[in-house]
């Protein structure tokens, strides 16, 4: 903004004659001065005189409004004000009409006694309204809005933004509209205050995270968006190079290599709110294409020190932003090994709000005569609850729906005996052993899942969740955190039978080089860890492999020779020749964090411009075709 020379003369005049910044400078903001002086001049005067309230002066220096709606109060009664916003609703009460005017901050009722003012006024127009602030009749107070005791009697309405088309949906009920329509008209959907509040909330959480990390001594450093493609992880989004024919950049799936290189560079603590790009399918808790992480890394740090940082920042954020009355797990968080998680919860993302636990009864049933259990992994869940025949039928339907052949169970009767289809296959002499093994007592029901180990764990986890939800056992109003650690370093592809990395290839194997050289790869654990909250994976992290000799061996086991390591991860390979420090970190997901805090079931509700489930931007039309000229410039020809 530029301030005209004549206006600077006026600023000097006001400064000379009214250094206290009282009456005259405030008089400048009267409506007649709005058109005499530019916004730049008014802004300059406001900041020359600190006596003007900061909140109001920032909204007073333009011709469209004197103040935003949340700042109109009973102190303004009988004053003339100009306000601006969108026409949310128009109501005709016979002789007098009302407009509900909405801006980003609040809604205010406007009284129209001159019907000619409403000529050409439509819902969702952007308007500026001038009038007198009045006290509402007490019986018309609206305690649901900040301006509920006042209204503006209009004597001038200016249309600032016309509505040329019929609205595709009602703004106030946009969340009830089909998702594809909402996403196509996202700029209208975001006018819905509930939708907008999610984005405002997101901004506040991110600001808090930045502040917290800075207070903890971390430096915010941005890493490149255009980088080299790497063979691990999900599919890359690739970007063709114009200057280098046949070569491509990739959008980063995470700032993994760059943040490790920062540690090699001598930085001690790094963080950023990092955009990450992965060409993978959508889920309720995973947005396709792009997502954001609170990415951080620490030099000369152990796993326990990273745990402490993760606990401090997440506990602080959740305690600050959780809905009123919610409990948040205090540090230190429970630590559950991957093996324990798969056994007791049937998943590596355990929901600790569910009190049910899974038991392994495989060995016991090898002594019984029930053929479907012999030679299989058998899991059991004990539940103390009254369950009707109808409940059992619905649970069986659920079980078959997820692929189970059936769902065995036993009920413990008043006399301590068992009732159920499996009872006759348990010899009497083994029933006391079974009672001790399962901890079962009168009123309990024990459900059984049997299959190969991985499938049995999956089925047990699904049944545990279904039981917890349908029996209303899930703890309410709580955020329950835990760490899951000791993940397997390697896994075998069931189809190719080849050994590959289970998760992050840059993790340090437990036992170091000795383990890599002497142990079965499938028995080697990694210093990898997740943070899980209410069954949602919030973060992954690891102690990094900073020893080149260990890294070469780890990649060799996963099928990559040293030349591939040099080619695909050349920067790390070379940097680690020059004294790489031990380092570790993690990256909590910002989108998932906000989804949990807002109680949303779909992650797209907390993203300003999300793609749909097919990774399409319905509003802007991405992905889109490009011209032949654009393709030629990057040396690409599209095949049919």
Q: Where are the regions that the model predicts?
A:
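Gram-positive cell-envelope targeting signals
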Residues: 23, 27-30, 39-41
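Serine residues within intrinsically disordered or low-complexity segments
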Residues: 13-16, 38
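Short, Lys/Arg-enriched N-terminal segments with co-localized hydrophobic residues
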Residues: 34, 40-59
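Class II aminoacyl-tRNA synthetase catalytic cores and aaRS-like
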Residues: 53-640
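N-terminal basic, low-structured, amphipathic or hydrophobic segments
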Residues: 13-14, 29-32
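Short, low-complexity S/T/E/D/G/P-rich linear segments that nucleate or cap local secondary structure
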Residues: 13, 21-23, 43-46
């Amino acid at each position: 903004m530029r301030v005209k020379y004549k206006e600077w003369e006026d600023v000097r005049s006001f400064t000379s004659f009214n250094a206290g910044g009282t009456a005259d400078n405030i008089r400048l903001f009267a409506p007649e001065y709005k058109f005499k002086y530019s916004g730049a001049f008014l802004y300059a005067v406001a900041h020359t005189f600190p006596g003007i309230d900061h909140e109001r002066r920032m909204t007073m220096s333009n011709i469209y409004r004197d103040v935003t709606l949340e700042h109109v109060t009973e102190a303004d009664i009988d004053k003339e004000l100009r306000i601006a916003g969108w026409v949310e609703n128009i109501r005709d009460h016979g002789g007098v009409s009302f407009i509900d005017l909405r801006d980003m901050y609040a809604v205010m009722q406007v009284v129209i006694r001159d019907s000619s003012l409403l000529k050409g006024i439509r819902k969702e127009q952007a308007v500026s309204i001038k009038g007198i602030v009045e006290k509402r009749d007490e019986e018309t107070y609206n305690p649901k809005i900040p301006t509920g005791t006042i209204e503006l009697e209009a004597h001038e309405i200016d249309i600032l933004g016309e509505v040329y088309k019929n609205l595709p949906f009602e703004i106030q009920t946009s969340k009830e509209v089909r998702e594809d329509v909402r996403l196509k008209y996202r700029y209208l959907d975001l006018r819905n205050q509930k939708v907008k509040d999610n984005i405002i909330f997101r901004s506040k959480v991110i600001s808090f995270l930045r502040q917290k990390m800075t207070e903890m001594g971390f430096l915010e450093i941005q890493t490149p968006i255009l980088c080299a493609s790497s063979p691990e992880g999900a599919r890359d989004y690739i970007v063709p190079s114009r200057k280098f024919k046949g070569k491509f950049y990739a959008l980063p799936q995470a700032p993994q290599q760059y943040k490790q290189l920062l540690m090699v560079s001598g930085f001690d603590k790094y963080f950023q709110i990092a955009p990450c790009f992965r060409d993978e399918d959508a889920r309720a808790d995973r947005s396709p294409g792009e997502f954001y992480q609170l990415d951080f890394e620490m030099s000369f740090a152990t796993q326990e020190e990273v745990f402490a940082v993760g606990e401090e920042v997440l506990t602080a954020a959740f305690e600050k932003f959780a809905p009123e009355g919610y409990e948040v797990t205090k540090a230190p968080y429970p630590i559950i090994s991957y093996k324990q998680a798969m056994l007791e919860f049937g998943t590596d993302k355990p929901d600790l709000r569910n009190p049910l636990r899974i038991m392994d009864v495989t060995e016991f049933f090898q002594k019984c005569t029930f053929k479907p259990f012999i030679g299989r992994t058998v899991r059991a869940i004990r539940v103390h609850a009254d369950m009707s025949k109808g409940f059992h039928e619905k649970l069986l339907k659920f079980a078959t729906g997820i692929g189970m052949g059936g769902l065995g169970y036993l009920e413990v009767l008043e006399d301590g005996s068992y009732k159920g289809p499996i009872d006759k296959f348990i010899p009497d002499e083994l029933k006391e052993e079974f009672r001790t093994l399962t901890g079962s007592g009168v009123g309990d029901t024990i459900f059984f899942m049997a299959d190969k180990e991985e499938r049995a764990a999956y089925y047990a986890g699904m049944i545990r969740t279904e039981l917890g939800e349908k029996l209303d056992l899930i703890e309410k109003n709580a955020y329950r955190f835990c760490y899951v650690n000791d993940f397997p370093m390697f896994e075998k592809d069931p189809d190719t039978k080849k050994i590959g990395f289970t998760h992050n290839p840059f993790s340090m194997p437990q036992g170091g080089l000795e383990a890599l050289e002497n142990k079965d790869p499938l028995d080697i654990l990694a210093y990898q860890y997740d943070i899980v909250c209410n069954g949602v994976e919030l973060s992954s992290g690891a102690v990094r492999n900073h020893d080149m000799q260990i890294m070469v061996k780890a990649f060799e086991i996963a099928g990559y020779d040293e030349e591939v390591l040099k080619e695909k991860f050349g920067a790390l390979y070379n940097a680690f020749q020059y004294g790489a420090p031990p380092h570790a970190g993690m990256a909590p997901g910002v989108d998932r964090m906000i989804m949990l805090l807002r109680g949303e079931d779909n992650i797209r509700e907390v993203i300003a411009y999300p793609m749909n489930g097919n990774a399409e931007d319905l509003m802007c039309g991405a992905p889109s075709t490009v011209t032949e000229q654009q393709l030629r410039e990057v040396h690409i020809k599209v095949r049919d």
